[in-house]
């Protein structure tokens, strides 16, 4: 009685999930197995292999039952699990995981999702008969000038309908158009191949303020005449320097050195203006001195008169 009350009493409600395990008697010490136990155990194991079920021990209220008690209870207190039919296990295949490892199924990759959403339904593709046949390549005479290809390389063709199914790259149709580029001042030669061209008589379009034509560079002035004139009439020291710089301008132009010619021309102009300014100032000063001397002489004569 004491062994039966080791579990939960009947008045106390069971707290374990069904099915409830009945209280089990305490485990007895196992008896030594006989000599024929391996054969019987093998036979018993073989019997369970043939039946396709496996017996698993269950926990009772008093603890883990012994192997003898489990063998006595048999199918009444055991759970059976389905097992595959008895046959020779195949050998491990090459690259297979070791036994006891679970192999997860390999899922296919996610499909490509197009982010662009179309508001309305796609237009139906036109029938194949409506598409015009590609023009046959013809050898035509090209107009004089340079030919600039608008697209380099070859690409694929665009499918009928003008749209591409999601998941595939867009392929463009090659453009075989060429834009003739004519040099400036050359009349346009058009018309049919082999015919005479039409010469354009229209005036050139007006150029904006930022499109100024490059004019030929004018040679710098040597200022030789003004240098000689200022040397004779005004101030000869700076006039001689101006004449020397004017000669340097002509020498630089003869050898094609435009930079040296511009520098010498600027110096010849400066020295010529200096000579002219000094000469004008000297003339004004001489005039003033002359007037002062004349007035002083007249005053002196009037002072000494009786």
Swiss-Prot record:
<keyword id="KW-0735">Signal-anchor</keyword>
<dbReference type="GO" id="GO:0030672">
    <property type="term" value="C:synaptic vesicle membrane"/>
</dbReference>
<dbReference type="InterPro" id="IPR007593">
    <property type="entry name" value="CD225/Dispanin_fam"/>
</dbReference>
<feature type="topological domain" description="Cytoplasmic">
    <location>
        <begin position="1"/>
        <end position="223"/>
    </location>
</feature>
<feature type="intramembrane region" description="Helical">
    <location>
        <begin position="276"/>
        <end position="296"/>
    </location>
</feature>
<dbReference type="GO" id="GO:0042802">
    <property type="term" value="F:identical protein binding"/>
</dbReference>
<feature type="topological domain" description="Extracellular">
    <location>
        <begin position="245"/>
        <end position="275"/>
    </location>
</feature>
<dbReference type="GO" id="GO:0060292">
    <property type="term" value="P:long-term synaptic depression"/>
</dbReference>
<dbReference type="Pfam" id="PF04505">
    <property type="entry name" value="CD225"/>
</dbReference>
<dbReference type="GO" id="GO:0050808">
    <property type="term" value="P:synapse organization"/>
</dbReference>
<dbReference type="GO" id="GO:0098978">
    <property type="term" value="C:glutamatergic synapse"/>
</dbReference>
<comment type="subunit">
    <text>Component of the outer core of AMPAR complex. AMPAR complex consists of an inner core made of 4 pore-forming GluA/GRIA proteins (GRIA1, GRIA2, GRIA3 and GRIA4) and 4 major auxiliary subunits arranged in a twofold symmetry. One of the two pairs of distinct binding sites is occupied either by CNIH2, CNIH3 or CACNG2, CACNG3. The other harbors CACNG2, CACNG3, CACNG4, CACNG8 or GSG1L. This inner core of AMPAR complex is complemented by outer core constituents binding directly to the GluA/GRIA proteins at sites distinct from the interaction sites of the inner core constituents.</text>
</comment>
<keyword id="KW-0472">Membrane</keyword>
<keyword id="KW-1003">Cell membrane</keyword>
<feature type="topological domain" description="Extracellular">
    <location>
        <begin position="297"/>
        <end position="306"/>
    </location>
</feature>
<feature type="region of interest" description="Disordered">
    <location>
        <begin position="1"/>
        <end position="142"/>
    </location>
</feature>
<feature type="transmembrane region" description="Helical">
    <location>
        <begin position="224"/>
        <end position="244"/>
    </location>
</feature>
<keyword id="KW-1133">Transmembrane helix</keyword>
<comment type="function">
    <text>Required to maintain a pool of extrasynaptic AMPA-regulated glutamate receptors (AMPAR) which is necessary for synapse development and function. Regulates basal AMPAR function and synaptic transmission during development but is dispensable at mature hippocampal synapses. Plays a role in regulating basal phosphorylation levels of glutamate receptor GRIA1 and promotes GRIA1 and GRIA2 cell surface expression.</text>
</comment>
<comment type="similarity">
    <text>Belongs to the CD225/Dispanin family.</text>
</comment>
<dbReference type="GO" id="GO:0016020">
    <property type="term" value="C:membrane"/>
</dbReference>
<dbReference type="InterPro" id="IPR051423">
    <property type="entry name" value="CD225/Dispanin"/>
</dbReference>
<dbReference type="GO" id="GO:0034394">
    <property type="term" value="P:protein localization to cell surface"/>
</dbReference>
<dbReference type="GO" id="GO:0030545">
    <property type="term" value="F:signaling receptor regulator activity"/>
</dbReference>
<dbReference type="GO" id="GO:0060291">
    <property type="term" value="P:long-term synaptic potentiation"/>
</dbReference>
<feature type="compositionally biased region" description="Basic residues">
    <location>
        <begin position="40"/>
        <end position="49"/>
    </location>
</feature>
<dbReference type="GO" id="GO:2000311">
    <property type="term" value="P:regulation of AMPA receptor activity"/>
</dbReference>
<dbReference type="GO" id="GO:0007611">
    <property type="term" value="P:learning or memory"/>
</dbReference>
<feature type="compositionally biased region" description="Pro residues">
    <location>
        <begin position="121"/>
        <end position="137"/>
    </location>
</feature>
<dbReference type="GO" id="GO:0098839">
    <property type="term" value="C:postsynaptic density membrane"/>
</dbReference>
<protein>
    <recommendedName>
        <fullName>Proline-rich transmembrane protein 1</fullName>
    </recommendedName>
</protein>
<keyword id="KW-0812">Transmembrane</keyword>
<feature type="compositionally biased region" description="Pro residues">
    <location>
        <begin position="87"/>
        <end position="111"/>
    </location>
</feature>
<feature type="compositionally biased region" description="Pro residues">
    <location>
        <begin position="15"/>
        <end position="36"/>
    </location>
</feature>
<dbReference type="GO" id="GO:0006468">
    <property type="term" value="P:protein phosphorylation"/>
</dbReference>
<keyword id="KW-0770">Synapse</keyword>
């Amino acid at each position: 009685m004491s062994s039966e009350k080791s579990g939960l009493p009947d008045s106390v409600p069971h707290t374990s999930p069904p099915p409830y395990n009945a209280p089990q008697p305490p485990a007895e010490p196992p008896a030594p197995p006989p000599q024929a136990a391996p054969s019987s155990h093998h036979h018993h194991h073989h019997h369970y292999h043939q039946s396709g079920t496996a017996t698993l021990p269950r926990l009772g209220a008093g603890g883990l039952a012994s192997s003898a008690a489990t063998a006595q209870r048999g199918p009444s207190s055991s759970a059976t699990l389905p097992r595959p039919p008895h046959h020779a296990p195949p050998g491990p295949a090459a690259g297979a995981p070791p036994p006891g490892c679970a192999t997860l199924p390999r899922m296919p990759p996610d499909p490509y999702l197009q982010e662009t959403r179309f508001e309305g339904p796609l237009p139906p593709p036109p029938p194949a008969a409506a598409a015009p046949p590609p023009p046959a390549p013809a050898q035509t005479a090209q107009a004089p000038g340079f030919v600039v290809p608008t697209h380099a390389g070859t690409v694929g063709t665009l499918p009928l309908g003008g749209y591409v199914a999601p998941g595939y790259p867009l392929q463009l149709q090659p453009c075989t158009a060429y834009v003739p580029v004519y040099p400036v001042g050359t009349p346009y030669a058009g018309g049919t191949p082999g015919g005479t061209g039409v010469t354009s008589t229209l005036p050139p379009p007006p150029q904006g303020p930022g499109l100024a034509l490059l004019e030929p560079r004018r040679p710098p002035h040597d200022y030789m005449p003004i240098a000689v004139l200022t040397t004779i009439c005004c101030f000869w020291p700076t006039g001689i320097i101006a004449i020397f710089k004017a000669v340097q301008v002509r020498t630089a132009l003869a050898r094609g050195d435009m930079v040296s010619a511009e520098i010498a021309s600027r110096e010849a102009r400066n020295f010529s203006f200096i000579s002219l300014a000094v000469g004008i100032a000297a003339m004004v000063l001489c005039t003033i001195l002359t007037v002062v001397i004349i007035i002083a002489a007249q005053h002196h004569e009037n002072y000494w008169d009786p």
